[in-house]
Amino acid sequence: MRGFRSHSRAWLAIASLVATALVLPSPALSQDASPAASGEATRSLTREEFAAQQQEELQYTEAATPGGTFIDANTADIQTVQPLLAEEEFTIEVLDLVYDTLVGGSLWNGQIAPDQLADYWEVAADGRTYTFHLNKNATWHDGTDFTAADVQFSADALANPETGSAYTGNFIGTFESWRAIDDDTFELIATEPTYTALFEILSFYIVPKHLWENVPLAEWRNDPGASGTDPSRVVGTGPFKFQEWIQGDSVTLVRNDAYYGKVPYLDSYVLRVWPDQTAMVNALLNDEIDAAELEAPDIAAVEGTPGITVVHYPTRGFSYYEFNLDPEVTTKWQDQRVRQALLYALDRESIVDNILLGYAEVAQGTQPVVSYAYAPDQVTTNYTYDPEKATALLAEAGWTDTDGDGVVDKDGEPLAFELLYQTGSPLTDQLVAYLQDAWSGIGVAATPRSLEFPALIEATTTNPTFEMALYGFSWNASFIQDFMFGCDQYQVGFNDMKYCNEELDAIYNQAKRTFDEEARRELLIQASNIVNDEQPVAVLYFNQDHDGFRDVVQNYRPSTWGEDLTQVWIQQ
């Protein structure tokens, strides 16, 4: 992953710095990263200027022996090879090697940076008009020239709900128009000056017009260029070219020697899919793979193994369960006291200490530890473990055990539901068992059901008939969270819950227009408190990531903000 990407859904990997645009003044122009804050035009760093900064910060070494294959691993397969349809984190990380966006992000502080298809960009004095100067050497993997017409085509597709992208809502809510000025220049005009405009295009992958323009948008998801069954249709501009996806087994990419940026040292990248966490960790210990994301119980064994390095770092991610608030599906969750009761029934300190072995932070609100709006001391509702309060809240909402069967009921309906979660992780199984037991203690009956990740997505988004689902999620570096909690994000964003609070929407909109960091921070704290009070989702804890990798893998530096596989090389 070359830099961070935008918000993405993560399979449940139980596992700041505010990001602004890196800018330089154009002649007589402002240094400020926020054009609306100064009323003057600004220009970003150039690709070359940013590359020099990156090398100074990260001190990558030159490969002694270029070549070789980096074998990555995961316990779930990717979803698709069509990047505009990708929703979850690992799919995006893999496709990020094949496809490019207009802008990327720095790996040391999360700032937006010119390391993708735009060599640099300018923001006009109106704070709304973004002009991107595209790399003239970029070509599609099939040899076709890349032009601004491809960017316009991709923007048109992303903006159309028929495409089925989870990023449509925020894109069309941010930009009012776009156009190709010429082959090498593209313009985006925001509806108003906003702090978040560049963050919204981190998920705006560019796809080849010549391969997709004759495919109806509604058919993209089932096209051979999305399933990978026709590799000639899986064509990007990135540092690696798609070779093969054997679903449920592996993805193979090969180096793009014609890449316009830093050509990878590696000959190829392979993702291997393992049936479960135990099998994947054993593969790392047996040198069958080069890297794997570890869960807390794996750390002690792997960390002491000669030839393997383990790194730990905080993430922008969190683990949570979400309620389906659509009354046509279920009426159980309409009273927020019921939703609050379920969280009071959980000893999250115990979850962190005994299941995660201390490698997480109990969540207080929705802003993660790495966010500039992280403020655990300012939460308005602190859900400390209190099963008696949980029982009292249920009773206030009319849920009591009237028939003595151990399950509370109301109007003859028991408070019983199905909890969906992703299969494949012993640690997730352990968490689910704890949730079920803790809720049983207050008379609430949860029936867990594990699903493969694509089926989980189907049950919560495409056909949202679920009652509750357990997930992980990763915020983008703006930390403005409307793409999950905004009223207009149901089925065009990540608002699976059908949650809507107009006051919250107004706060998010104000935060987007607020360029002063401290003022924006206060707004985001307000927003976090509203969500934390109303509980459309229950944020359990903020994740840490733990990556284990073989010592022969050089320049591999996973972090909060991603890693750069073009720099990785294998020591022979």
Functional labels for PLM-detected ranges:
Residues 158, 177-179, 243-254, 270-330, ...:
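Extracellular/periplasmic solute-recognition and catalytic clefts
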Residues 119-164, 181, 187-189, 280, ...:
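Aromatic- and charge-enriched surface segment that lines or borders ligand/interaction sites
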Residues 106-108, 204-264, 268, 387-392:
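Gly/Pro-rich hinge or "lid" segments in bacterial periplasmic/extracellular proteins
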Residues 71, 147-154, 185-189, 238-239, ...:
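Alpha-helical secondary-structure segments
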Residues 169-219:
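Surface-exposed binding/hinge segments that line
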